[in-house]
From Swiss-Prot:
Catalytic activity: (R)-pantoate + beta-alanine + ATP = (R)-pantothenate + AMP + diphosphate + H(+)
Name the UniProt record assigns to this protein: Pantothenate synthetase
UniProt pathway annotation: Cofactor biosynthesis; (R)-pantothenate biosynthesis; (R)-pantothenate from (R)-pantoate and beta-alanine: step 1/1
Residues noted as binding beta-alanine in the record, renumbered to the chain: 59
KW Nucleotide-binding (keyword) present: yes
C-alpha cells in the first residue's frame, strides 16, 4: 500500500472517516530506528497507522534549535513506507496554529522539574500539540517512546485526567550497540563527542547496579554521578532517581524506580533513563 501524505486537517479527517482502528505516532520528523520501532508497534495493533510530522514551535524555548531542527521529509516518507505506515500527516504551522494559540494545556507541576526545569514551558507546548493531534486524528491507540520518559508520563496523565478514549503504548528505547540512545540530536555530535556520549548510559547502568546492591542514599548517588560526568567535561542538567509510577523523587518505600539524566556534550543536549526495581 502506498503511503499517503496529507497536510490538511480537513483532508485527514475525511480520509479517516469510517476507520475503526487508528494508531497515531506523533513525531517531529528526522526519523531514525527508534521512531520506526514505534511505527512497527502501531502497525501490530491497528488497521490504520497515522504518523504525524510536525516541528512544533510551542515546545521550543527562545534559545533552542527550532530553525535548525532537521527537516528530512523525503527520507522520512521512504522509511515510513517501508515500516508499513498508511498516512503521514504533515501540517504547516499555519494549519496547526491558524491564529495565536491562546488556549494551552497546563501540565501538572512535575512538568517544571527534570527537563522542564531547564526548558520552561516545554511541556505546555508538548501537551497542547498532542491534545490537538488527538482531537484531529481521534486515534484509538497512540505510541510514544520511553526515552522521553517525562513526556510519556505527562501524556498518560493528559489521557487519564481528560478521560480520552486512547490507549497509550510505550515503546522501549532503541540504542546503538554502544548503548547510546537513538536520538535525532545525535547527528549534531562530532566523532569524539559521540564516543564520549556512550558514557551517559553506562553511568546510569552503574547507578542501577549500585542501588540494586543495596545503596539507598539516592541524593549522594545523584551528586557523585553528576560530579563524575562534570569532571569529564559534561554539562549536567540533572541525574535523578525517581518513582517510575509518580515521577516524584524516590523514597525508601518505592520499589519501581527510574533513573533519568540530561546532560550536554558540547552544545548537544542528551537525555536517557533506565527503569528498574528494588
Amino acid at each position: 500500500m502506498t503511503l499517503q501524505i496529507i497536510p490538511e486537517i480537513s483532508s485527514l479527517r475525511a480520509r479517516l472517516a469510517g476507520e475503526n482502528s487508528i494508531a497515531l505516532v506523533p513525531t517531529m520528523g528526522n526519523l531514525h530506528a527508534g521512531h520506526i520501532h514505534l511505527v512497527e508497534l502501531a502497525r501490530q495493533r491497528a488497521g490504520c497507522v497515522v504518523t504525524s510530522i510536525f516541528v512544533n514551535p510551542l515546545q521550543f524555548g527562545a534559545n533552542e534549535d527550532l530553525d535548525n531542527y532537521p527537516r528530512t521529509l523525503a527520507e522520512d516518507c521512504a522509511k515510513l513506507q517501508a515500516a508499513g505506515a498508511d498516512i503521514v500527516f504533515t501540517p504547516s504551522v499555519q494549519e496547526m496554529y491558524p491564529t495565536t494559540q491562546t488556549m494551552r494545556i497546563t501540565p501538572p507541576p512535575i512538568a517544571n522539574e527534570l527537563c522542564g526545569a531547564a526548558r520552561p514551558g516545554h511541556f505546555d507546548g508538548v501537551a497542547t500539540v498532542v491534545m490537538k493531534l488527538f482531537n484531529i486524528v481521534q486515534p484509538h491507540i497512540a505510541v510514544f517512546g520511553k526515552k522521553d520518559f517525562q513526556q510519556l508520563f505527562i501524556i498518560r496523565e493528559l489521557v487519564r485526567q481528560f478521560n480520552l478514549p486512547i490507549d497509550i503504548i510505550a515503546g522501549e528505547t532503541q540504542r546503538e550497540h554502544t548503548g547510546l540512545a537513538l536520538s535525532s540530536r545525535n547527528g549534531y555530535l562530532n566523532e569524539g563527542q559521540k564516543l564520549e556520549a556512550q558514557r551517559l548510559y553506562r553511568t546510569l547502568k552503574l547507578i542501577v547496579d549500585n542501588v540494586q546492591q543495596g545503596n539507598r542514599d539516592y541524593p549522594a548517588i545523584e551528586a557523585q554521578s553528576s560530579q563524575y560526568l562534570t569532571q569529564l567535561g559534561w554539562i549536567v542538567d540533572y541525574i535523578s532517581i525517581r518513582s517510575s509510577t509518580t515521577l516524584l523523587p524516590a523514597s525508601l518505600d518505592d520499589h519501581n524506580l527510574v533513573v533519568l539524566a540530561a546532560a550536554r556534550q558540547g552544545n548537544t543536549r542528551l537525555i536517557d533513563n533506565i527503569e528498574f526495581s528494588v
